[in-house]
């Protein structure tokens, strides 16, 4: 078994409701609302207008910068609106609203690669870019940027199939039902990076998936190795996965690529397979719909832009006593206040919690037990990080306590007996640091422009 990482927690995985349920195809809704930002980086610019006819897989959003990814129509039909709509990250986001014509017309430009084995790394990067593929484990970093920046620098390519968040089972079902997509996608990455093997990291509680993948690897004679990992949260975090499989620790302030590792989510790998072998860009997402507030939990494959209310409807609806909705897992997901938000490329789960779920009340008084320090997988000191942030000392939080190294896994908040909002506070701290950096950059650019104007 692979190495264990420091810290971590063992929450009840709560996967029994869906881990034996096959993925169901959700019928496309009458209307999809596709946000122009489903990735880290610059939002896309809409390239369609009201009244335009669109087809499945047609590009409707042009990347707004280098770190960006195009967006495609998930249904065929007519553009009904291009306007701000409620967004899962909060507030609103410019979105393209498409009225479904239910003809399922596919864009004529979509076609598979004639000879996948002959693809050069540069050609694969271009295919991935045009397909709008991003990290689908939640981070949503554009995959073509990750590949191109890692070429010639990494010797470990790892597929993240840990799926360590409670409730979520979409990756597990994908491995059981679509193992060829996983292995062929991994093989494309092996050839692209020029590595002898690609490693797939799977937690020990999914041994049946590991067995299915190993059988497929043998049948395809693929350069892929399955590594069974300890069942511990957050085993699927990039830096912890890098350490578990390669034995290398990512330095403070650095990325896995700086330790010679490049890590891809399992569904991202399947999207690479689809882009090459079918030509289809990212137009759908497997989503686990679960939680005590869901009448009939399921794993659903949904068109991008499907309103989350349609997912719950397909699962028999919500219980009356439901009090909270979360997009993503319970540890790192985001609470939602609006049923009009829609499925995006990084949506792995929609959870609903009813009145019978255990609820806690946050208490402001830290008892200095140190549990948060013992479970932090980054070896940080959340007890002090929180206190300095509450005092407004962001400088000490950032530079002395290395607050920017926090991976926001939520292990500290999970174990805190005082129920202090530690993870939320650290996210706010990061936002303050990033805002200060952006302000400093804008000031420097303005001063430079003023100096150049004066010289002219």
Regions of interest found by a model, annotated:
Residues 1-47:
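N-terminal, Lys/Arg-enriched amphipathic/low-complexity engagement segments
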Residues 49-62, 81:
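Short, well-structured beta-strand-loop connectors
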Residues 77-79:
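Conserved hydrophobic positions within beta-strands
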Residues 81, 86-141, 151, 207, ...:
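Acidic low-complexity segments
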Residues 106-107, 135, 157-171, 293:
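Gly-rich Lys/Arg/Thr-decorated short loops/hinges at beta-loop-alpha junctions or inter-strand turns
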Residues 162, 196-308, 314-319, 329:
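Hydrophobic alpha-helical positions that pack around
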Residues 176-192:
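Histidine-anchored nucleotide/phosphate-binding helix
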Residues 347-363, 373, 377-456:
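Ferredoxin-type iron-sulfur electron-transfer modules in oxidoreductases and energy-metabolism complexes
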């Amino acid at each position: 078994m692979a190495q264990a990482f420091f810290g971590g927690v063992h929450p009840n995985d709560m996967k029994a409701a869906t881990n034996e349920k096959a993925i169901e195809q959700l019928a496309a809704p009458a209307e999809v609302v596709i946000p122009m930002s489903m990735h880290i980086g610059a939002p896309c610019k809409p390239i369609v207008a009201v009244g335009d006819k669109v087809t499945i897989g047609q590009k409707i959003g042009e990347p707004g910068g280098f770190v960006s990814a195009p967006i495609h129509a998930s249904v065929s039909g007519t553009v009904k609106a291009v306007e701000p709509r409620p967004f899962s990250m909060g507030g609103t986001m410019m979105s393209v609203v498409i009225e479904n014509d239910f003809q399922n017309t596919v864009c004529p430009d979509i076609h598979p690669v004639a000879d996948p084995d002959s693809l050069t790394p540069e050609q694969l990067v271009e295919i991935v870019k045009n397909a709008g593929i991003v990290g689908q484990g939640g981070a949503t970093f554009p995959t073509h940027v990750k590949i191109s920046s890692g070429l010639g620098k990494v010797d470990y390519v790892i597929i993240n199939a840990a799926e360590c968040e409670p409730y979520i089972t979409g990756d597990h079902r994908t491995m059981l039902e679509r193992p060829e997509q996983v292995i062929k996608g991994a093989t494309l990455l092996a050839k692209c990076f020029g590595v002898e093997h690609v490693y797939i990291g799977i937690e020990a509680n999914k041994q049946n998936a590991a067995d299915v993948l190993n059988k497929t690897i043998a049948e395809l004679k693929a350069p892929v190795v399955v590594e069974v990992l300890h069942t511990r949260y957050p085993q699927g975090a990039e830096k912890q996965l890098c350490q578990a499989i390669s034995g290398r620790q990512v330095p403070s302030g650095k990325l896995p690529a700086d330790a010679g590792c490049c890590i891809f989510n399992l569904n991202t790998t399947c999207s690479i397979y689809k882009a090459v072998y079918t030509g289809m860009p990212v137009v759908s997402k497997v989503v686990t719909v679960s939680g005590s507030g869901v009448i009939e939990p399921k794993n659903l494959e949904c068109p991008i832009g499907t309103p989350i209310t349609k997912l719950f409807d397909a699962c028999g609806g919500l219980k009356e006593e439901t009090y909270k909705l979360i997009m993503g897992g319970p540890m790192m997901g985001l609470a939602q206040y609006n049923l009009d938000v829609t499925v995006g490329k990084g949506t792995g789960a929609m959870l609903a919690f009813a009145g019978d779920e255990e609820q806690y009340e946050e208490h402001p008084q830290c008892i200095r037990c140190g549990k948060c320090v013992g479970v932090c997988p980054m070896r940080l000191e959340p007890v002090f990080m929180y206190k300095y942030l509450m005092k407004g000392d962001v400088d000490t939080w950032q530079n002395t306590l290395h607050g920017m190294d926090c991976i926001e896994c939520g292990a500290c908040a999970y174990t805190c007996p005082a129920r202090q909002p530690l993870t939320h506070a650290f996210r706010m701290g990061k936002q303050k640091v990033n805002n200060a950096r952006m302000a400093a950059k804008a000031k420097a650019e303005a001063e430079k422009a003023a100096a150049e104007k004066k010289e002219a």
